[in-house]
């Protein structure tokens, strides 16, 4: 018996209902079918590896208030995350970069029309109890320790990850700060196929498209932060240039570097910009304070939900703070900022 016909209905009514079906019955059937076959939305969030800890927490907060949503998080090098959107048709709904300028230079205007600057970081040198000279290294002698024959240090690829090119910028800035013109040559040039050009007070590091001829007895080089962290912990090598927040999150020991070279402070921006770096794709980056950027790409499948995720981040700055990444409050925004976010943002041109 048709479930939409009340018990006790006349036989003729039953037959007609079975043969032809009523309009109301059809409508109800369609509605129920839709409810059964509609899949919940899964939001795809792509972000720099150094954001893994806070973004795990942001996912929990977001899902608490959007219980019909799934979240797929994907960490990687910022350049790789963006290139997947541009070249591989990746449909990330949220993109967060460890270098805000990558959004403006690589994504705008075709793949994004706005972004926010929302948190900062700085470069430190992390180590473990297994590291050689762990009891001797400090903020004044680190470049001498790294140059010792039985010391191996690591950083991520400058062609793939902002932390990689920032690590090299830090080493180059050290030459200027300590007034020792051989630091970059001793640590980088002698052990890689990198180059450097010095002109009019500006030092430009040159990274070839193909990084090769790495002295693997001296340097541990991988594409992403996750690939360099575990080997450090297990004693594969001794020291790692990494973000302070990541070192804190992984309970690593580290030495802090002078503010003049660690890329962590706005007041030293004029000093930082004395160093530039040209990556393998020919793009030149100027050293500047480490500031994260976030956007919802134009290619996102779920624009509205992506904006809601960004709003969740802005509503809960304590998550970034607890992860060792000081927030910029209010966030600084550029471009066509969504209306839902404007109350949290200082918009600039």
UniProtKB/Swiss-Prot annotation:
The keyword Glycoprotein does not apply. The lineage of its organism: Archaea, Methanobacteriati, Methanobacteriota, Methanomada group, Methanococci. This is Uncharacterized solute-binding protein Maeo_1470. Disulfide bonds: none annotated. SUPFAM superfamilies: Periplasmic binding protein-like II. GO terms for molecular function: molybdate ion binding; tungstate binding. The keyword Signal applies. It holds the Pfam family SBP_bac_11. Keywords: Signal. It comes from the Archaea. Residues 1-25 form the signal peptide. GO terms for biological process: molybdate ion transport. InterPro entries: ABC_trnspt_W-bd_WtpA, ModA/WtpA. Belongs to the bacterial solute-binding protein 1 family. WtpA subfamily.
